[in-house]
Amino acid sequence: MYVEMIDETGQVSEDIKKQTLDLLEFAAQKTGKENKEMAVTFVTNERSHELNLEYRDTDRPTDVISLEYKPEVDISFDEEDLAENPELAEMLEDFDSYIGELFISIDKAKEQAEEYGHSYEREMGFLAVHGFLHINGYDHYTPEEEKEMFSLQEEILTAYGLKRQ
C-alpha cells in the first residue's frame, strides 16, 4: 500500500507518522487492499471545520474526515480485451488503485485520548483505521453496519497491538 502523508500542522512526530503508515499497511493486508493508494493529512480543528463545511455541510470540526474516491466514469472491458492489451489492463489497475484520503484532526485526537483515558498514540491509530475502513466502503449508519465495522476496527487495532487501556 502506498500512503502519501502530509502534516499541515508541523506537530506530528515521526513516531506517529510511522505508526500511522505501519497500521494502514497492516489494515490493508487484513482487508485485502495491499495494492491501493491513499493520502493522510494531519490537520488542526480549524482546518477540520473548514473541510467539514466544504465537503459534508457540517458546521464543526470532527476527529477524522474520510473522502472515498469514486471515479465518475465506469470503465469496464471484458477479459479478452484485457488479455490482448496488457497496457490497457495496467492503466485500469492504476486507475482503480487510489481509494481516497483521510484528514485527521490532531487537536480532536488529543482531546479524545484524554476524554477516553487512553494514549494519544492509540487514538491516532484508531482514527486512521476508522477512516481507512470508511474509504473502503464500511459505515455505521445501521446497527448491523456498525457491528461489522467496529468489530473489524477493533480486530485490526488489537492484532496490531493498540488495545484499549
From Swiss-Prot:
Single strand-specific metallo-endoribonuclease involved in late-stage 70S ribosome quality control and in maturation of the 3' terminus of the 16S rRNA. Belongs to the endoribonuclease YbeY family. GO terms for molecular function: metalloendopeptidase activity; RNA endonuclease activity; zinc ion binding. It is found in: Cytoplasm. Zn(2+) binds at residues 130, 134, 140. Binds 1 zinc ion. PANTHER family: ENDORIBONUCLEASE YBEY, CHLOROPLASTIC. Its main location: cytoplasm. This is Endoribonuclease YbeY. It comes from the Bacteria. Its cofactor is Zn(2+). GO terms for biological process: rRNA processing.
